[in-house]
């Protein structure tokens, strides 16, 4: 088990190597992402972290004598956690210049000294060509680097395929010998020898085919894992606007298209392509037997291609329609399950069932049209195949009768023709799958080709103090949408408690979304401690802002896991203290499992008020410098709200607090109250100042609630 010190050394070595390659890294981001406070920062975590910041790292085991040929600098990995950065080796390999991350100094070792500390493990590091956070355009060309990456393994598959095709070439020759020699001359001894040889060939063919399938499946599975991992990482890195502009079911449907690509990669299509590649050899042998019969087979190949090209656009249009209907069904299903309480309470199940039946009927009809086109395509392929077989048999019989070829040669030719046509038939039958994969790649591309949130280029970012400033901020959610915020100028000093009130739709919550950098203002600047948020790393920002919404989602984990979600390294005492401040400790203690109670999906095992208090504790446990309450207490009963209001002075201590509320009693004691109206700041002052203005919007709203 690595110590915290060794984990720190590993992380520091990563930062140094990144800086060497002109990549700036925020150490705290890496610590947070890989939880180095409580977990080891081992080889796997190191490699993943290197990949995430734009480095290409590979862990290898090399003999000491081969260190002179590796690319430097490289990380010398040691089991005791005392790693070294190997910077330079003299030409005669007599001196080794290394940097010690623990001692923060460069050291020079002789060959014998360095050989003693070297344990045979090294991490090679180079920089990637692509920019961190951005992906190359996702289409079929995305798989080319994977093919290059696994070229050695794929070369093995190609070699095995060549042997398989060679064995397939021998089989027809055996039949020819049996028909033309053994049967004619009644050569039983020759028959026995051929049979034994045939059995050996069959065994080798089975073994090699199994080996090829295993190697190929293993390689495609690795490509599948890479794509799946990249998809999920990219999905979480997308801006909030991506998810707000799409229904959940549609996004889920696009992600599920990965299954279609997975089935295609692990199916027969690619091995059929390999088999087709070796058909050239078979054609040469077939031409030797009979040029006329070979021409029949060759002329049939364009027929397969033309028919497939004719069917393709019809099939693709119907597959596209099928996907859209399936995505609509997915979205409707997710929406229905999510809103099941509302549907039950309003007794609208019959209407929902009618809508589902209508959509399902449309999807089934679309699927039937896909199957109809696919069936037509397959029947056309079979018609071509059987027509070629009849023509070959008719011509072959004429050639046998005329004495141009023997019966054995005709049988051997037909077997060879079968070996050539089989992969063509398989590919033609798999054309539907290829069209489906094309649709899947296109739909996944909608996710993977969407730009992720831009990260900061700064290396070290200071901790937030809490000064906030909005300068001439104007914002709308879309370029042709309504202006939500207009000419917002606001300065909030660190440690202030600010209340934001106003009518619904006045831009209160949008203000806090901009503060979390979910969106970038159309014009103007938002500054925290003088740092422009449009240039800041969103992870650095959000780790130091605690947010409690009106409706908060809890994960299907224990209460303690939900409270410490953003910072698993905090102690139990810190988590309990946060729960006390949030008024959650007492009810948690009364639960049978206490803090280990599983809350259920989205916290369904708890009441709304209990979920809200846990969400408040979750926001407080990280000790954020800025705390945002967006209607956070509106779902609480008066007793729970009273507990939080009593603790408000402790909650607000040494942090900037922004409270958005419709219930004006919540913000009564704030240092300042900002009144929003139609995207503008209409009023600004204390409760007493605003209430004294009888014609003010705040006084009007307060009077309505009195």
Curated annotation (Swiss-Prot):
Residues 468-703 form the ABC transporter domain. The active site is at 83. In HlyB the peptidase C39 domain, the ATP-binding domain (NBD) and the transmembrane domain (TMD) are fused. This is Alpha-hemolysin translocation ATP-binding protein HlyB. It comes from Escherichia coli O157:H7. SUPFAM superfamilies: ABC transporter transmembrane region, P-loop containing nucleoside triphosphate hydrolases. Keywords: ATP-binding, Cell inner membrane, Cell membrane, Hydrolase, Membrane, Nucleotide-binding, Plasmid, Transmembrane, Transmembrane helix, Transport. It comes from the Bacteria. Part of the ABC transporter complex HlyBD involved in hemolysin export. Transmembrane domains (TMD) form a pore in the inner membrane and the ATP-binding domain (NBD) is responsible for energy generation. It is found in: Cell inner membrane. One of its GO terms (biological process) is proteolysis.
């Amino acid at each position: 088990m690595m110590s915290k010190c060794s984990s720190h050394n590993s992380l520091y070595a990563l930062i140094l190597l990144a800086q060497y390659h002109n990549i700036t890294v925020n150490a705290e981001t890496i610590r947070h992402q890989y939880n180095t406070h409580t977990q080891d920062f081992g080889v796997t975590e190191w490699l993943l972290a290197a990949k995430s910041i734009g480095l290409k790292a590979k862990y290898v085991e090399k003999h000491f004598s081969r260190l002179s040929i590796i690319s430097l600098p490289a990380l010398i990995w040691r089991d005791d956690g005392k790693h070294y950065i190997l910077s330079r080796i003299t030409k005669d390999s007599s001196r080794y210049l290394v940097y010690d991350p623990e001692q923060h100094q460069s050291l020079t070792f002789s060959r014998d000294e360095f050989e003693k500390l070297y344990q045979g493990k090294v991490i090679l590091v180079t920089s990637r060509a692509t920019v961190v956070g951005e992906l190359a355009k996702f289409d079929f060309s995305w798989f080319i680097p994977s093919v290059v990456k696994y070229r050695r393994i794929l070369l093995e598959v190609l070699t095995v395929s060549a042997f398989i095709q060679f064995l397939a070439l021998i089989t027809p020759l055996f039949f020819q010998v049996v028909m033309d020699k053994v049967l004619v001359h009644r050569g039983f001894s020759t028959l026995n020898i051929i049979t034994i040889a045939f059995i050996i060939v069959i065994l080798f063919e089975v073994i090699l085919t199994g080996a090829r399938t295993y190697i190929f499946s293993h390689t495609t599975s690795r490509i599948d894992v890479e794509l799946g991992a990249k998809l999920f990482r990219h999905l979480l890195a997308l801006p909030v606007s991506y998810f707000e502009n799409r229904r959940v079911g549609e996004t889920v449907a696009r992600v599920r298209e990965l299954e279609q690509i997975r089935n295609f990669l692990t199916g027969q299509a690619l091995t059929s392509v390999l088999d087709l590649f070796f058909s050239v050899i078979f054609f040469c042998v077939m031409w030797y037997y009979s040029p006329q019969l070979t021409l029949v087979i060759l002329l049939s190949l364009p027929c397969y291609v033309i028919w497939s090209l004719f069917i393709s656009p019809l099939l693709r249009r119907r597959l596209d329609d099928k996907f859209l209907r399936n995505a609509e069904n997915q979205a409707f299903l997710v929406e229905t399950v999510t809103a099941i309480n509302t549907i039950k309470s309003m007794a609208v199940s019959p209407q929902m069932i009618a809508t589902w039946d209508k959509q399902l009927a449309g999807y089934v009809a679309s699927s039937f049209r896909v199957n109809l086109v696919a069936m037509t395509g397959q029947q056309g392929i079979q018609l071509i195949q059987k027509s070629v077989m009849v023509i070959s048999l008719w011509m072959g019989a004429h050639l046998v009768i005329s004495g141009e070829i023997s019966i054995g040669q005709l049988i051997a030719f037909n077997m060879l023709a079968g070996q050539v046509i089989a992969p063509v038939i398989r590919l033609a039958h798999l054309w539907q799958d290829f069209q489906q994969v094309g649709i899947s790649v296109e739909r996944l591309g909608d996710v993977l080709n969407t730009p992720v949130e831009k990260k900061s280029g700064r290396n070290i970012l200071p901790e937030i103090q809490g000064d906030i400033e909005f300068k001439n901020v104007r914002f709308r959610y879309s370029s042709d949408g309504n202006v939500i915020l207009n000419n917002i100028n606001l300065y909030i000093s660190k440690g202030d408690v600010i209340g934001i009130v106003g009518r619904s739709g006045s831009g209160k919550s949008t203000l806090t979304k901009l503060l979390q950098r979910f969106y970038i203002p159309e014009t103007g600047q938002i500054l925290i401690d003088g740092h422009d948020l449009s240039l800041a790393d969103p992870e650095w920002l959000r780790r130091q802002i605690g947010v409690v919404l009106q409706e908060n989602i809890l994960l299907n984990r224990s209460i303690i896991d939900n409270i410490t979600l953003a910072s698993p390294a905090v102690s139990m005492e810190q988590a309990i203290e946060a729960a006390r401040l949030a008024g959650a400790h007492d009810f948690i203690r009364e639960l049978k499992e206490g803090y280990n109670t599983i809350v259920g999906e989205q916290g369904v095992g708890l009441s709304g008020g209990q979920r809200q208090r846990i969400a408040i504790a979750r926001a407080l446990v990280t000790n954020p410098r800025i705390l945002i309450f967006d209607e956070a207490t509106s779902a609480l009963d008066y007793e729970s709200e009273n507990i939080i209001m009593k603790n408000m002075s402790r909650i607000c201590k040494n942090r900037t607090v922004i409270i958005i509320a419709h219930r004006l009693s919540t913000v009564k004691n704030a240092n300042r109250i900002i009144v929003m109206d139609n995207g503008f700041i209409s009023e600004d002052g204390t409760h007493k100042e605003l209430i004294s203005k009888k014609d003010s919007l705040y006084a009007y709203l307060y009077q309505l609630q009195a």
